[in-house]
């Protein structure tokens, strides 16, 4: 990706945030919630998971683009939007891309790219905080399924999540 393409993504991001986030941000902050519709809007603008492969409906760019989108949201003072975006596009989608089955990739990645599905991360625990070495939630294989035992708090994007990556031992 050259600097000109990256600049175009930055400009597109700024315009989308000015139009879709800025007019509502104060209200969202007071309510401690970003509306679900924002995910659909960002997906329609091609801003969600842009570095995922084109076969899933993404732009197939480099991770540099997702970092630039986070930078622009942060520069504009939209830290909560930047954090939720980062979890969705930079953590959950890559987990599915690298560790998911073909069936999971085909099911989830197009929906995450479009904003139809929102990804969340459940890592923080009451006794451990975000220290992954202190995690107590465990996962036990039971036939074809996994049983999770434990508690999570402060789940980023949890309110709207369709898919949650859970940190467990």
Set out the residue ranges of the language-model regions:
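Short, solvent-exposed loop/turn elements at beta->coil junctions and helix N-caps
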Residues: 55, 123-128, 153-154
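Short glycine/proline-enriched turns and hinge-like loops at secondary-structure junctions
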Residues: 61, 131-133, 157-162
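A short, Trp-centered hydrophobic/proline-enriched beta-strand micro-motif
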Residues: 115-123, 167
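Cytochrome P450 C-terminal beta-domain/meander region
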Residues: 131-149
């Amino acid at each position: 990706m050259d600097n000109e393409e990256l600049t175009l993504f930055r400009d597109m991001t700024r315009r989308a945030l000015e139009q879709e986030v800025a007019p509502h941000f104060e209200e969202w902050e007071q309510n401690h919630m970003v509306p679900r519709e924002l995910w659909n809007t960002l997906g329609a603008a091609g801003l969600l998971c842009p570095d995922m492969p084109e076969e899933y409906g993404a732009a197939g760019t480099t991770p540099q683009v997702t970092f630039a989108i986070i930078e622009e949201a942060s520069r504009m003072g939209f830290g909560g939007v930047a954090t939720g975006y980062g979890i969705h596009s930079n953590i959950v989608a890559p987990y599915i891309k690298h560790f998911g089955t073909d069936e999971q990739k085909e099911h989830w990645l197009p929906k995450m790219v479009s904003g139809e599905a929102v990804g969340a991360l459940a890592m923080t625990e009451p006794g451990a905080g975000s220290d992954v070495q202190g995690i107590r939630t465990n996962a036990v294989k039971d036939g074809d399924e996994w049983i999770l035992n434990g508690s999570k708090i402060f789940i980023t994007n949890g309110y709207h999540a369709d898919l949650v990556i859970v940190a467990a031992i």
